[in-house]
């Protein structure tokens, strides 16, 4: 039998070394050994330090977990007015000039950490973006930015895969993998793909949902945030402790390449 391959990492709570399946770390490989887990880039992040990158990686896991649970569970998002988000007025003006429609919704999780999903409707396809951040406004801005960034690519993809799109419109059960899912919310598709399980007509200002996502600000306070500054390691430790209170263990592997180490 072909030996299974493991990579050494660390438990974030204790710092103890642990063994991680290789495909969780080097997820773009085609290994010679039989895989028993599907590796993805979920949880991969960069930062100005290992601690900061770890914080962003954990937040991405929270984003993906919240998004998928809401999607599969059809858990309603809380519709939020994109125009009430600070710092995005110029981007929304550009979106309006293009004739696109934008929606934003707060997705809820057990930690009350802010996670937003945004949708851009170009008229031919809907592009989605999602983001988690400890700051409520920061999470909303990042979700909107991601959706806007994805929109041109989604338009090109739908045009290039027109035959596949028509087949999925006829029968969405034909969807086979993750590449098919972005082709479902298109013009002529089923109405259930048209919204974020929230009515845009009921959108509220972002400050109204602040109490439903206060977990992020609580973590910042416990980590000693002062004057907008916080030590990344303290933030990492508070985030890890918050997650592990629900019995979820967290691990990390430093993926930095040698040339990245040389660059600092």
What function would you assign to each model-found segment?
Residues 1-264:
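Helix-biased "structured C-terminal domain" signature
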């Amino acid at each position: 039998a072909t030996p299974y391959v493991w990579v050494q990492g660390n438990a974030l709570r204790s710092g103890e070394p642990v063994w991680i399946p290789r495909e969780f770390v080097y997820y773009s490989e085609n290994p010679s050994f039989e895989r028993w887990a599907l590796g993805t880039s979920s949880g991969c992040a960069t930062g100005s330090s290992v601690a900061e990158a770890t914080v962003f990686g954990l937040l991405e896991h929270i984003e993906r977990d919240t998004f998928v649970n809401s999607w599969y569970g059809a858990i309603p998002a809380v519709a939020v007015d994109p125009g009430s988000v600070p710092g995005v007025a110029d981007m929304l003006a550009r979106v309006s000039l293009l004739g696109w429609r934008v929606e934003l919704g707060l997705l809820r999780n057990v930690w009350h950490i802010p996670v937003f999903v945004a949708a851009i409707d170009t008229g031919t396809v809907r592009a989605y973006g999602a983001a988690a951040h400890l700051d409520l406004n920061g999470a909303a801005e990042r979700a909107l930015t991601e959706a806007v960034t994805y929109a041109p690519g989604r338009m090109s993809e739908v045009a290039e895969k027109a035959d596949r799109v028509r087949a999925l419109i006829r029968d969405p059960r034909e969807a086979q993998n993750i590449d098919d899912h972005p082709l479902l919310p298109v013009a002529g598709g089923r109405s259930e793909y048209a919204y974020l399980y929230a009515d845009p007509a009921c959108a509220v200002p972002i400050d109204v949902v602040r109490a439903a996502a206060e977990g992020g600000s609580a973590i910042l306070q416990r980590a000693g945030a002062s004057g907008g500054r916080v030590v990344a390691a303290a933030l990492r430790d508070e985030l890890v402790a918050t997650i592990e209170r629900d019995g979820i263990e967290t691990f990390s592997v430093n993926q930095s390449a040698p040339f990245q180490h040389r660059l600092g």
